[in-house]
């Protein structure tokens, strides 16, 4: 009985040691598409003017991290923390494995070859101090989610944060 108790204790201690050696990880969604980075604070003074503003300098980079599957962005949704700012990819836009797209503010011509989609809206989507970026699959399931604060997530203060390399 004493040997059995010792063996059980040794196994439990070993399991705890193994668990403590694993680094803490954020919960990851099962999705090939991930938020690669965000230019949440456009360079210069913010201006929502469609003709002279800088909303096209605010962008979100979404990347297909699959090594074998092409993903169509049609139906994917991007939201901010309050969900008042929302963009739905309404057209077919295919991301080959390893490819990316920049979702920009303002107006322009969407281009698969240029890796850009415009929101056709001159309002800024992301807050300059803090916000949450939510990416949803067409089914409504989460694809990726990140929160940031200017002081905690952007130490060099350039308004750009990288999430997935």
Per-segment meaning from a language model:
Residues 2-11, 22-74, 124-128, 151-152, ...:
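A structural motif detector for short, solvent-exposed N-terminal "entry" segments of globular domains
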Residues 15:
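Conserved structured catalytic cores and adjacent interaction surfaces
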Residues 27-34, 45-47, 86, 91-165:
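Solvent-exposed beta-edge/loop recognition patches
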Residues 39, 66, 75-77, 82, ...:
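A mature extracytoplasmic/lumenal domain signature
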Residues 51-53, 78-84, 110-111:
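Extracellular beta-rich ligand/substrate-recognition surface
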Residues 61, 77, 132-134:
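Residue-level detector of beta-strand face positions
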Residues 71-95:
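The feature marks short-to-medium sequence segments in extracytoplasmic or secretory-pathway proteins
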């Amino acid at each position: 009985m004493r040997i059995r108790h010792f063996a059980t204790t040794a196994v439990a201690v070993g399991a705890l040691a193994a668990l403590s050696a694993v680094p803490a990880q954020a919960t990851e969604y099962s999705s090939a598409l991930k938020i690669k980075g965000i230019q949440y604070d456009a360079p210069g003074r913010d201006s929502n003017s469609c003709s002279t503003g800088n909303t096209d300098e605010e962008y979100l980079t979404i990347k297909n991290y699959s090594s074998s599957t092409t993903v169509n962005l049609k139906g994917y949704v991007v939201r901010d923390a309050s969900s008042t700012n929302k963009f739905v990819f309404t057209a077919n836009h295919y991301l080959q494995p390893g490819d990316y797209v920049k979702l920009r503010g303002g107006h322009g011509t969407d281009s698969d070859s240029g890796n850009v989609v415009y929101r056709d809206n001159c309002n800024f989507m992301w807050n300059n101090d803090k916000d949450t970026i939510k990416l949803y699959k067409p089914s409504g399931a989460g694809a990726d989610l990140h929160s940031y604060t200017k002081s905690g997530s952007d130490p060099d203060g350039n308004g750009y944060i990288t999430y997935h390399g």
